[in-house]
Amino acid sequence: MNLRKKDCKIAVIGTGNAGIISAIMTIYTYRLLNLDEPRLTMFHDSKVPTELTGQGTTLNISHAIEKIVCDEDLNNPAGITPKVGFYYRGWGKKNEKILYKLGENAMAYHFDPPKLRQAFLNKDLVDVIEKHVTPEDIKDDFDLIIDCRGKSVNNWDEYYDMPSPTNYCLLGRTRDGRPPEVWTEHIATPDGWTFKIPLEDGYSYGYLFNDKITSPEIAEKNFDEMFGMKTLHKVPFKGYLSKNYYDQKNKTLLNGNRLFFFEPLESNATPMYGIAVNEFINSVIRHGEKGAVYAKKKYQILIQETYQWVMWHYMYGSKYDSEFWKYAQDQSKNYKYSKHFLSMIDYVRRTCNWKKYVGQNEFPERIISEFDYNDYATWYFSNV
């Protein structure tokens, strides 16, 4: 496999969120390496519905979006909003509110997936073909195929089961102007937890619970009562991870929901989509086919630890002593974490200055817009 050659051709199957992120990260990786960009082709099948996904990133994806697509300036075609960290409300027993930054003065983005998709395609950086294809159909025409077709429902033997405390999500949306918050909120509820994402024109909500403990009908009622939110979509799910990240025979790298799905705590999916592409291309360019094997092993370890990171968040329960939280806490405490993960957690415990993160992170009452964000950032970073 030679991804360095000038006439390199890469295909992305699927133009949903994972497909778009894969294409963006492919271009971004080649530009960082100062290499000629490959001929990039995206295959779109309008008969396949796009999976409903979250809209949060961490630093790797945000840098790529800013360099390849757009930033907040010039009419903000991707609908991005700033994100400085995660705000936990009601998690654990000691502190009602905890906000932590992504890193010193670092900033990521929230985004509107349909807007990001269209903004990227409008750049004319890729060829888009409306056609249903499989990797086997096109393997002879491309040097690498990134398969983002979503999860097939009938091949569970090809995946590891990755259970989590939640298995169901109710989605809601407001459209009432730009919110003031610049963080993703994770709000504990008696049934589970809810994400609240500030977008350009309102909030995106996701009410997560376990349907073995709370019925969807009761959860829908509670979603409305707690957040004033009408359910737009009901999404049952299960956690899984593909046993084969890279198919050497068909030169195919899996990504998106074709590769894995975990519950959306800490916006884990989108950044992992970017890492999958970046790590693989970098390794293959440097080491050829051996690099593909190395990237596969490294990514499997990383994604396993991402899953452990999600599970660990339930370790100390929440302010609710509900059936769900007792179940979630037991599942977290009984999980067999890797030694490397536990050593990482121990290091964070010993070295982190938690006073920076607890009890002083309310945002100002005035509305924050893109025009006074710099003033807000100055206030924020002087108060955490």
Regions flagged by a language model, labelled:
Residues 79-151:
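Feature captures the FAD/FMN-dependent oxidoreductase FAD-binding
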Residues 119-227:
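Predominantly flavin-linked oxidoreductase catalytic cores and closely associated redox partners
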Residues 282-384:
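Long, low-complexity C-terminal extensions of enzymes
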